């Protein structure tokens, strides 16, 4: 069955071939994107459970406290006199 009388068979076949190939390529890239998304999310979960992140946060808080005390020595004197 010919869809268009002006076209010969090689163009019709190429169109069908392209349709299948395009679907296969789309399916391939969707799988690859899905894999990469899975790997990225699992890495983020792993880093979220990591103790290193917690340690960095603790050290950051300690350094901020030291800097505050260094920049405002009056606050330390008030705290020692009150306590």
UniProtKB/Swiss-Prot annotation:
The lineage of its organism: Eukaryota, Metazoa, Chordata, Craniata, Vertebrata. Belongs to the FAM240 family. InterPro entries: FAM240 (IPR040261). PANTHER family: PROTEIN FAM240A, PROTEIN FAM240B. It comes from Homo sapiens (Human). This is Protein FAM240A.
